[in-house]
Amino acid sequence: MTAPWRRLRSLVWEYWAGLLVCAFWIPDSRGMPHVIRIGGIFEYADGPNAQVMNAEEHAFRFSANIINRNRTLLPNTTLTYDIQRIHFHDSFEATKKACDQLALGVVAIFGPSQGSCTNAVQSICNALEVPHIQLRWKHHPLDNKDTFYVNLYPDYASLSHAILDLVQYLKWRSATVVYDDSTGLIRLQELIMAPSRYNIRLKIRQLPIDSDDSRPLLKEMKRGREFRIIFDCSHTMAAQILKQAMAMGMMTEYYHFIFTTLDLYALDLEPYRYSGVNLTGFRILNVDNPHVSAIVEKWSMERLQAAPRSESGLLDGVMMTDAALLYDAVHIVSVCYQRAPQMTVNSLQCHRHKAWRFGGRFMNFIKEAQWEGLTGRIVFNKTSGLRTDFDLDIISLKEDGLEKVGVWSPADGLNITEVAKGRGPNVTDSLTNRSLIVTTVLEEPFVMFRKSDRTLYGNDRFEGYCIDLLKELAHILGFSYEIRLVEDGKYGAQDDKGQWNGMVKELIDHKADLAVAPLTITHVREKAIDFSKPFMTLGVSILYRKPNGTNPSVFSFLNPLSPDIWMYVLLAYLGVSCVLFVIARFSPYEWYDAHPCNPGSEVVENNFTLLNSFWFGMGSLMQQGSELMPKALSTRIIGGIWWFFTLIIISSYTANLAAFLTVERMESPIDSADDLAKQTKIEYGAVKDGATMTFFKKSKISTFEKMWAFMSSKPSALVKNNEEGIQRALTADYALLMESTTIEYVTQRNCNLTQIGGLIDSKGYGIGTPMGSPYRDKITIAILQLQEEDKLHIMKEKWWRGSGCPEEENKEASALGIQKIGGIFIVLAAGLVLSVLVAVGEFVYKLRKTAEREQRSFCSTVADEIRFSLTCQRRVKHKPQPPMMVKTDAVINMHTFNDRRLPGKDSMACSTSLAPVFP
C-alpha cells in the first residue's frame, strides 16, 4: 500500500501547486484590462479625396481586426476603437471630438491629418499626457515643446536629402521644382539650398492654387525647355499632372519627372508605360517582405469587395502609404501597451486638465519601440518623436510597369541596384521597334535626292553617306525612322538674342529625335543639344579656283636661282678675281722668266694681270679652260676653293634648271589663311549660320578675328549654302572657307577647284540628339562598332571616290619650247653683237695707228685692210714696217708693271723683250 499512497500524495501536491501558480498568474492578467480602446479622428470630404479618407478609416478598422484575430499579440485583451469624423480644417470640431474620446478612456488618438486640426488635437493630448499618433507630414518648429506625439511619416528633411542624392546621381545640372502649397518650400529646404553647395541650377514654380488645371504651367515649362522636373504634390494632383502632360505631348523620353509623393506606386500608370517618359518616385511600403505581401493582399481583397472607386487615378484595391502607416501605428501602440503592465486607463476630462498618470510612461514606451512593419523599419527619435531612420525604395516606370531600381537610407545613402547601375534609373531600355524622326539637310555627298525615272516617296527619296550611316544604325539598334528636311535649310546657329535655328532648333523643340547630317560638334551647340561621338573628323580649309599656269619668260633659265643668289655669285666672282690679282702680285712664285733661253735676261713676268684674273674666274665659272694656271700655293688655294664653289653652284643650277624648265609652275595668289587676312582683293567667306562661320565669329586668334571682321563687314561674303559658295569660287575671285571633307568631295569632281593650304582647325561631325536624350549613348556605341568594322571608311570611299581629274602629262620628257629657253639665244645674240662691236673698235683703233706709222691716209689704209679681209682664201699678209728698237728708260718703266728685273743684273733686256718705239 505504500507505493499507491505515495502516488496519491504526489497527485495532490501537483494539484495544489497548480492552484498556487494560477493564484500568482491571475493578478498579472488582471493588470492588463480586458478591453483597450483607441481613438481615431478622420476628415471626410465629398470630392476626389473622399475615397482616401474612407481608406484611412478602413485601415484603422482593418488593423484592429488583425490584432484581435492574432491572439498572441494581446492575449485575453480586445482592442476596440472609437472613430470620429470631422470636416476639413474644422479645428473646433476636432477639439470636441478629441475630448469625447478622452472621456471614453482611449490610450492614444490617431489623426487627424490636416494641419490646423492636428495642432488642436496635439495640444489637448500634450496637456492631458495622452500619446498622439500622427501619420502625415507636419512642420514642427524648433521651439516646439509638445512631447506627447510621434509621427510615422518619414522626416521630410531626410526625404529631401534622398531627392538631392538622386539628382546628383542622375548628374542633373539644372532642374525645376514645382510645389503644391507653401509647405512644400519647407519640406524641400535641403534641395532648395543645393545650388549654394552644388553646381545645380534650380527654378522654383508653384502649381495653380484652388485649381487642378496645371496645363498653363506645363505649357510654360515646355516652352522654356524644362525637361527635368521635381513635383512636390499629392498623389491626386500627380495623377492630374500626368494626364495633362500626356495630352500636351510631354510624356516622352526627353522628360524626366520625379514625384515626392510616396503613393506613386498606387497610381494607374498603364497609359504611360510605352511613352518612354522617365518617371521616378519613392516607396516606403516594403513589398519585398512576404509577410507584408500577405497583409497587402488581404487588404486588397477586402477593398475590392467595397464600393467601386471613383475616377481618382488609383489602382483598384491598392494599399496606400497612409493606410500602411496607420496599420503600423496601431500595431506599435498595441505592442507597447502589452509591454507596459500594471497600467490602467481612466476617463479624462478636458476641462479638468488632469493628466493621465501613466501617459508619460506609455509615451516613452512608444518612442523607444522598434518595429518591422509594412513600411519597413520603424524607429523614432526619442527627442523629437520623428521617424528619421527608414528605407526608401527608388522606383522607376518601365515598359513592364514600376520597378525597384535602388534603395535609399539616411545611413547608407543612395544605392542603385546592379540592373540599373551605369545607365540611370529611368533610361529607356531599348530602341527596338521605336520610330524616330530624323532631321537633315541637303548636302553632297552626305544627303542628296536620289535620281530615278519614277516618283519616289518617303525615305527612298534620299541617298548619300548619312543615309547609309542611318541605315547601318537602324540595323544595329533595331529602330525605324522617318527622314525630314529641315524647314529653313540651316544647320543651326544662335542669333544675337540667343535663339537657335536650323536642325539644332528642331532638336531643342523636340520636333526631331536625331539630326543625321554633316553637323559639326561645337562648344556652343553642346550647350543646347547632345552629340554622339564623331563619325568623321575634319577641319576648316580654303576652297579656291585652281591657278592657271604662269606664262614662261624668255629668261626662265634664270629662275633656278633667286635674284639674291645671282647677285651673291656676281659679287663672289668680282671678289675672288680681285683677291687673286693682289695675291699673285705679292707672291714671288707667280713671277717667271719669260725668256729662259736667254741666260742674261733680267726681266720676269706675271700672268695674272687684272684682266687675266677676271678671265680666270670667268673660265672656271663657265667650266671652261682659261690657259692660266696658278703656280704659287696661295693662288692655287684660291683657285681650288673657287672651283669647288663653282662646282656646287653649277651643279645646283643644272639640277634645278630641269625642274624649272620642264614642269609648269602653278602660282596661286594665296597659300594660307594668313595670306587671305593680309589682302582685300580676293573676297572670302563661309556658309551663313554654319559651324565654320561660328568658328571665326568666336575665335580669339588675331588672324581669324581679322578675317571675321572682313566677312561681317561685307554681307556678300557669307553665302546661303555650299552650292552658292562653290559657284562663286568658280566664277569670281572668291575663296570659300568650308570643311575639308566637302572640299575633298568637290575637288574630286571639279578640276578647276583646289584646296589651299592645310587645316585651320580640327573637329568632327556627330549625330545630334535633344538634350538628355536616352538615345545618345546607344548611337555612340553603334558608331564605334561601325568604326571598328571599318564600315565608316568603306562608306566614305563609296561616296567620295569620283572619276577624278585627269592626270597631268609627264613634263620630264617633253620638248622645251622657245618660250622657256629663248633667253639663251638672246644672250648669245647679245654676245655676238658685242663681239662685233669690239672687233670694229679694235679694227679702227689698229688701222689708225698703222696709218700714222706708215704715214698713209686713214681711208686708204681702211680700204686696203677691208679688201684683204674680204679675200677669204688668203691667210698671209705683209707685216707692217717694224719700228727702230732703242733702249730707253721710258720703255723700261712702261714694262715694270708686268715685268721686273732679275736682282743683281743690269737693266738690259733682249731685243725681243724691248718695247718698240714708234717715231
Swiss-Prot record:
It is a multi-pass membrane protein. It catalyses: Ca(2+)(in) = Ca(2+)(out). The lineage of its organism: Eukaryota, Metazoa, Chordata, Craniata, Vertebrata. Residues 585-636, 842-919 are cytoplasmic. Its main location: membrane. GO terms for biological process: G protein-coupled glutamate receptor signaling pathway; glutamate receptor signaling pathway; modulation of chemical synaptic transmission; negative regulation of synaptic transmission, glutamatergic; regulation of membrane potential; synaptic transmission, glutamatergic. L-glutamate binds at residues 518, 520, 525, 691-692, 739. Keywords: Cell membrane, Disulfide bond, Glycoprotein, Ion channel, Ion transport, Isopeptide bond, Ligand-gated ion channel, Membrane, Phosphoprotein, Postsynaptic cell membrane, Receptor, Signal, Synapse, Transmembrane, Transmembrane helix, Transport, Ubl conjugation. Residues 1-31 form the signal peptide. The chain crosses the membrane at residues 564-584, 637-657, 821-841. CDD domains: PBP1_iGluR_Kainate, PBP2_iGluR_Kainate_GluR7. The modification Phosphoserine is found at residue 869. Homotetramer, and heterotetramer with either GRIK4 or GRIK5. Can form functional heteromeric receptors with GRIK2. Interacts with PRKCABP. Interacts with NETO2. One of its GO terms (cellular component) is terminal bouton. The postsynaptic actions of Glu are mediated by a variety of receptors that are named according to their selective agonists. This receptor binds domoate > kainate >> L-glutamate = quisqualate >> AMPA = NMDA. Residues 32-563, 658-820 are extracellular. Glycans are attached at residues 70, 76, 278, 381, 415, 426, 433, 548, 551, 752. GO terms for molecular function: adenylate cyclase inhibiting G protein-coupled glutamate receptor activity; glutamate receptor activity; glutamate-gated calcium ion channel activity; glutamate-gated receptor activity; kainate selective glutamate receptor activity; ligand-gated monoatomic ion channel activity involved in regulation of presynaptic membrane potential; transmitter-gated monoatomic ion channel activity involved in regulation of postsynaptic membrane potential. Gene3D superfamilies: 1.10.287.70, 3.40.50.2300, Periplasmic binding protein-like II. Belongs to the glutamate-gated ion channel (TC 1.A.10.1) family. GRIK3 subfamily. Ionotropic glutamate receptor that functions as a cation-permeable ligand-gated ion channel, gated by L-glutamate and the glutamatergic agonist kainic acid. Binding of the excitatory neurotransmitter L-glutamate induces a conformation change, leading to the opening of the cation channel, and thereby converts the chemical signal to an electrical impulse. The receptor then desensitizes rapidly and enters a transient inactive state, characterized by the presence of bound agonist. There is a cross-link at residue 887 (Glycyl lysine isopeptide (Lys-Gly) (interchain with G-Cter in SUMO1)). This is Glutamate receptor ionotropic, kainate 3. SMART domains: Lig_chan-Glu_bd, PBPe. It comes from Homo sapiens. Disulfide bonds join 99-350.
